[in-house]
Amino acid sequence: MIKDFFILDFSYEIKDNIPLIYIWSIDDEGNSCVVVERNFKPYFYVVYEGNGDEIIENIRKNCEVLLITKVKRKYLGNVVDALLVQTFTPTQIKRCREKISRINGIKSIFDADIRFTMRYSIDFDLRPFTWFKAEVSEVKLEGFRAKKVYILDKILSHYEGKIPELRAIGIDFQIYSKYGSLNPRKDPIVVLSLWSKEGSMQFSLDESMDDLKIIRKFVDYILNYDPDIIYVFDVDVFHWKYITERANSLGVKIDIGRKIGSEVSQGTYGHYSISGRLNVDLVGLLMNERLTGHIDLIEVANYLGISPKRDSLNWYEISRYWDDEKNRDLVKQYSLENAKSIYLLGNFLLSPYSELVKIIGLPLDKLSVASWGNRIEASLIRTAAKSEELIPIRMDNPNRSSKIKKTVIEPKIGIYSDVYVLDISSVYLSVIRKFNISPDTLVKGQCDDCYVSTISNYKFKKEPSGLYKTFLEELSNIQDTRKSKVIEELMSSFYDYIHWINSRWYSREIASAVDELSYEIGKLVIDLIKNSGFEVILANDFLVFVKGGSGDKLNELIFKINSLYDLNLKVRKIYRSLLILGNDRYAGLLEGDKIDIARIGKEDRDLCELVRNVKRKVVEEILISKDVKKAVKLVKSAVIKLRRGEFDIGELITWVHIEKDFSEYDKQLPFVVAARKAIQSGYLISKDSRIGYLIVKGHGSVHDRAEPFFFVKEKNRIDIEYYVDQLLRESLKVLTPLGVSEESLKKTNITDILDMFGASKKK
């Protein structure tokens, strides 16, 4: 029969030494299904010199291979002799690659680290969120939860079409732990909430239900509802790791995929994979957005207008709320609202990111945690494969390049009104396309008909179009028809990609050439803006901030520049007010009182909540009132309250995610000392845990006085002056560039005290 299938994801397994590829799909009747490919074999390429037959014989002696074929392929644009080496299973490629790399006559090995399912999707140009038409046979195979199972006979065509209605849910759960560092062996899940198109479902701890039953009911719900997409808001890849470890400790398997027996497991990019379903980490999507400083669910949902601002509960306080039966409904409602926000946020992001999935070819769950560099490279591999270009193996590259400093004016520190932000990232894209800069056009010898960089004299062939130019032109053509923000972001990120030293096609010459040529054009553009009556107050690699003149005049100038230099400059944002503190350190107020903060708060994750909040309020006050004195009063008021004991202990806790083994950390870091104290007292603190600590009074260095937060019950034990110093130090990072001295900020008089109580009078 001939049927059409909408692709969700790919996976594979080995049966009887035969790799089976599963194309998880929705068929043209709306059924969840799996299409099984039985005939595709893993392979890689070897570039050789000398006697090909002898080399083939040596490969066969060293490796268990299925087939070796002599082929012609391209490497960096040049046709080369190569061997296509097929193996029986994907795992044999790595073993074979290591053995044959030492054989005489073998120059290089290519395509050997491309995932098996990605190789298949590239060769047949199958991309998630697109359709394919195929000859298939419906079969009854055990081991699947999909409604239909098909054996693939032949792919007939592939095309883009309407996305079918996908079943999606948002998930949130809360954990009971009195000691902050969550231990899946002992800390139960007290409430688990789900939200879907049909509404809510919640399971919670009570006399009739322990968390073993919660987990079982959760598994049953997923299997019965059968979602195509599961949305999570998974900071530090925490949720799935915890729930799987908790389930294992209770003797339960989280077997919720469409392949029976395939448990939730960690995949290629660090995400947790669920067979046949897309497990999408929304934090991963948001953290890869430029200028997105929010990773808090409530803040980002409010910022995007998805759900209103609401109160947040600290995860380490859940046990306190749960112990008070009057507050249990508060925890339940909080978790339910989280699940709803996650579901709505997921659907909000689905539309733009589905476009990116089609272009890059990564399933949405993998794309959600892949960096922009990995996204670009996945797409570049597809472009290269179309022209039979060999794919280099990724490896560490010590041959670093240094970027040319492209900030062509010193930032004008201060507070500004009505600032236009111009996106100039098209300068780099234009340079790459205009000068055909690419690894396969780079000429290291003599060349009489090449483009040449301005400083280092790097040469690039004018014809044919290189890999990078071809890739960017393909994206540009797509963008012309779809006007997608995420495609635009993908193109803008290409500059960072060419400077990524661990990319497959990294070249110091290319990175330097793009820097040299784009610097010259960027300087001409900025000079033209300044000479047209606008004031340039900040310019970095991607953005130029200008003020003065009308919007119409600026649009006319942009049109002129784009025509003159073949660029695509555009106004990205308009700030009602803008605070500039240095290179790439700024904050802006948009319409609707939305605030962007860039780099000012980059180091804030190592601060306690109170200091972070005061620092943000200082920035907000400056942007809204443009009154530095009010911001100073805000800091002084916070200091007074801190010294008066008007705070919650939880506000002073500093939280750290432990990403490595303790042996890899400096022993004198406060969180390491606090964690060791907790371990010595019998608490489980390990890699991937979170530790919260407080600095207490006493003698010795600060790190020696770091205590796990659950050791500190009274406020009078806390070293308040440590936190006052931290508050002042962080506030001065914002206020000092605006003319506020440390001495004046520390000085507190009677007026400051009266201001705190609203008792001083303005005259």
From Swiss-Prot:
The EC number(s) this enzyme carries: 2.7.7.7
KW DNA repair (keyword) present: no
Protein keywords: DNA replication, DNA-binding, DNA-directed DNA polymerase, Nucleotidyltransferase, Transferase
InterPro entries found in the cross-reference section: DNA-dir_DNA_pol_B, DNA-dir_DNA_pol_B_exonuc, DNA-dir_DNA_pol_B_multi_dom, DNA/RNA_pol_sf, DNA_pol_B_thumb, DNA_pol_palm_dom_sf, DNA_pol_type-B, RNaseH-like_sf
Gene3D superfamilies according to UniProt: DNA polymerase family B, C-terminal domain, DNA Polymerase, chain B, domain 1, Palm domain of DNA polymerase, Ribonuclease H-like superfamily/Ribonuclease H
MF (Gene Ontology): DNA binding; DNA-directed DNA polymerase activity; nucleotide binding
Gene Ontology biological process terms in this record: DNA-templated DNA replication
Name of this chain's protein: DNA polymerase 3
Record organism: Saccharolobus shibatae (strain ATCC 51178 / DSM 5389 / JCM 8931 / NBRC 15437 / B12)
Gene symbol of the encoding locus: dpo3
